[in-house]
Swiss-Prot record:
It comes from the Bacteria. It holds the Pfam family ATP-synt. GO terms for molecular function: ATP binding; proton-transporting ATP synthase activity, rotational mechanism. Keywords: ATP synthesis, Cell membrane, CF(1), Hydrogen ion transport, Ion transport, Membrane, Transport. This is ATP synthase gamma chain. The gene is atpG. Disulfide bonds: none annotated. Belongs to the ATPase gamma chain family. It is found in: Cell membrane.
């Protein structure tokens, strides 16, 4: 019986060791990707801050006719761009985004329109019988303006055709390697940041006010969505790194227990065999 128990434990130890190698490898890759994503996010934050400051300066001018990007078009429906991951093994990253989405639309599902970014968003929402009108998958490790333009084109077409009145983004804000927060940000109609202290300034447009405003508005929307996608991507890799580190640590704890159990059974088996040999020798005397 002891021999069978030892074989079973050895098999389990081997299986856990193999799994640990996988979780450790995934964790190392996630750490490398996190470093790259974080560097890109920090660079983008600086640029986005400048764009945001320009936009808040425009919004602070009460006498300026802002145009379609700044006005409510009177439609009841709201669009939510839900940013998730294409792959799993990232802890509660996707679950938190979906929970935030469900919480946000819970009071008005009929007037909520969904676009998903990432395969996991589509999969999760289908479980709750929520369909998306468009899906964007296979997002690169570092999102670029190419992906942003494709998503915005779909969203803005809905807005211009008065099928929706708002464009909101459900994303994960990267705070630090140990803290990420699922949030909702309205990007259209464009409004001043709640914490902005921007005062009204004189804004002069050349050569044409409408052309300049439209250009700045489109730049602002692209950079806002890009920043939110970079936040989400950085948060995803951080969550994956943490999840894999935790899995590797748990594997080590389990291996310690199994090795201890294996040694105890083996020691007990050896002791029993010695006792039987000694007992047999004494019986023959």
């Amino acid at each position: 019986m002891a021999g069978a128990g030892l074989i079973a434990i050895k098999r389990r130890i081997k299986s856990i060791n193999n799994t640990k190698k996988i979780t450790k490898a995934i964790g190392l890759v996630a750490t490398s990707k996190l470093r790259k994503a974080r560097q890109k996010l920090e660079l983008n934050n600086a640029y986005y801050s400048s764009v945001n400051e320009i936009m808040n300066g425009i919004l602070a001018d009460k006498n300026l006719e802002k145009g379609i990007y700044f006005k409510d078009n009177g439609v009841n429906k709201k669009l939510y761009i839900v940013i998730t991951s294409d792959s799993g093994l990232c802890g509660g990253f996707n679950g938190n985004v979906i929970a935030k989405t469900l919480e946000t639309i819970s009071g008005d599902r009929e007037n909520s329109v969904i676009i998903t970014v990432g395969k996991k968003g589509r999969t999760y929402l289908k479980k709750f019988k929520i369909d998306s009108i468009a899906e964007f998958v296979e997002i690169p490790e570092i999102p670029t303006l190419k992906e942003v333009k494709a998503i915005l084109e779909k969203a803005l077409n809905l807005y211009m055709n008065k099928e929706i009145s708002e464009i909101n983004v459900v994303y994960t804000h990267f705070v630090s390697s140990v803290k990420q927060e699922a949030k909702v940000k309205k990007i259209l109609p464009i409004t001043m940041e709640e914490d902005s202290e921007q005062t009204s300034t004189f804004v002069e447009f050349e050569p044409d006010k409408n052309i300049v405003l439209e250009g700045i508005s489109e730049l602002y929307l692209k950079q806002t969505l890009l920043n939110l996608m970079l936040n989400s991507k950085t948060s995803e890799e951080s969550a994956r790194m943490t999840a894999m580190d935790g899995a590797t640590s748990n594997a080590n704890d389990l291996l310690d227990k199994l090795n201890l159990q294996y040694n105890r059974i083996r020691q007990s088996s050896i002791t029993q065999e010695i006792s039987e040999i000694v007992g047999g020798a004494q019986a023959q005397e």
